[in-house]
Amino acid sequence: MALSSSSTTNSLLPNKSQLVQNQSLLPSPLKNVSFTTNSTKPVRFVQPISAIHSSDSSKNPIVSDKPSSKPSPPAATVTAAATTVTKTEWTVESWKSKKALQLPEYPNQEELQSVLKTIEEFPPIVFAGEARSLEERLGEAAMGRAFLLQGGDCAESFKEFNANNIRDTFRILLQMGAVLMFGGQMPVIKVGRMAGQFAKPRSDNFEEKNGVKLPSYRGDNVNGDAFDAKSRTPDPQRLIRAYCQSAATLNLLRAFATGGYAAMQRINQWNLDFTEHSEQGDRYRELANRVDEALGFMAAAGLTVDHPIMKTTEFWTSHECLLLPYEQSLTRLDSTSGLYYDCSAHFIWVGERTRQLDGAHVEFLRGVANPLGIKVSDKMDPSALVKLIEILNPDNKAGRITIITRMGAENMRVKLPHLIRAVRRAGQIVTWVSDPMHGNTIKAPCGLKTRPFDSIRAEVRAFFDVHEQEGSHPGGVHLEMTGQNVTECIGGSRTVTFDDLSSRYHTHCDPRLNASQSLELAFIIAERLRKRRLGSQNVLGQ
């Protein structure tokens, strides 16, 4: 049940009637689930074990050994610029016939194959029904009826894996989601860069220090960041540890999302201690107090605030699809739809360095049914983007493709309009999302990488300005951030200076927004969503 609302106030704070919308259930892992384990044959078309998926109704038996009757995707030929891509029948291993970039070289191939076979027998980390639900939500964002909030670590680590860190990142995402929801008065789709975001692409295969040359650090699921030969040697056993950490992280996230922690009645308790007395903390507390007032009003009016929709939230996981042998090992045939899903995460994306039309990563992704992201910089040719979307989404399904732009503010204003126009001319449905982090990385005088908050804010504003100019929908934001009180990005209202960087610089890879900076950015985005909403209302009222 929802109260009607047509707020025209200039405040980002909620009316008492805006609270019932946008809270819904996380697809529960405790319902009947469906997955299949990979066979040990070189080419796997049929998996031997299947069961009903979470969030899906099905008349199929709980256990079945019948092969899927779902045909493989038809062959097609796609040409982009000077590259001709011939699409043949897809299998979970067809990517191996393509050139695969950014994959580590394991010295012990027998051990690697043994580990991958072990992971094939493990349960899926996520369920296909959950990925389909996310695709539906992203389809709404493509139409301007929802907004994606995607955030988390640049790269998860084994060392910082603990319940408090997971809780704090989840908590700041809840806070940001509440701010965005009240600004835009639309559902906010919360997706974490969590429970699997380990592997990182590198510019160089090797790193050299003081005349010593070693393999580059590629993420904790591949090798260690310590600069010694043992740490830097790719170790297959790290894949099993990454799987276990991902499963444990998602287990805790599910508990937070469905166990009462995410209840709207707890909105005042989400504030992190170190943001308590900041400007952003004060703004958030004022918003939270209005929420409490509205909940009290609802209870007095006889509207229950104990309904599950007010006590839970949907939350999904995502990571870059980089380490293809691992992703293949967690790919399962869904008995409900007859489609393959990469069950390592709900949402996976292809990066700037691995999105070649004839490359192994694109070949793998075209055959899995998860919602997919494409990272796009100012180097992306509009026609190549159209061809890539054709390969990954030949049925032009809403929610299937999310374009994550990472360009820097000035490049955004120049390059993004051409991409939007090319996609529109092709009639393709995509969700446009801004990644204001990767195009704004600089080196501080002390030698550490950092990102100026002013540059991040400028790119977000440019993203909204371009979509307003083009008449398209700004569908979301993709952030590298943490709930910890780190000093990695300079600027923000609680100014972090170059001199402050070394005090709490904990990232294993790229600099992240801290909780205060993340919340400040959420208020900035919420204001743009509010103005966009009021502008649409004014147009409709004329």
Curated annotation (Swiss-Prot):
Supply the enzyme class, top level. transferase
State the compartments where it is located. Plastid, Chloroplast
Tell me what turns on expression of this protein. Answer: By the herbicide glyphosate and wounding.
Record GO cellular component, one term: chloroplast
Which Gene Ontology molecular function entries are recorded, alphabetically?
3-deoxy-7-phosphoheptulonate synthase activity
Question: What reaction is this protein's catalytic activity?
Answer: D-erythrose 4-phosphate + phosphoenolpyruvate + H2O = 7-phospho-2-dehydro-3-deoxy-D-arabino-heptonate + phosphate
Tissue expression per record: Leaves, stems, and petals.
- List the InterPro entries: Aldolase_TIM, DAHP_synth_2
Give the pathway annotation. Answer: Metabolic intermediate biosynthesis; chorismate biosynthesis; chorismate from D-erythrose 4-phosphate and phosphoenolpyruvate: step 1/7
Supply the alphabetized keyword list. Answer: Amino-acid biosynthesis, Aromatic amino acid biosynthesis, Chloroplast, Plastid, Transferase, Transit peptide
Q: What is its EC number?
A: 2.5.1.54
**Protein origin, superkingdom:** Eukaryota
- Summarize what activates or inhibits it: Activation by tryptophan (a hysteretic factor).
GO annotation, biological process: amino acid biosynthetic process; aromatic amino acid family biosynthetic process; chorismate biosynthetic process
Q: Where is the transit peptide?
A: 1-76
Q: Per the annotation, which location comes first and is thus the protein's main one?
A: plastid
Q: Where is this region: Disordered?
A: 54-76
Family of the protein in this entry: Belongs to the class-II DAHP synthase family.
Protein's UniProt name: Phospho-2-dehydro-3-deoxyheptonate aldolase 1, chloroplastic
Organism of derivation: Nicotiana tabacum
Q: What's the name of its gene? A: DHAPS-1
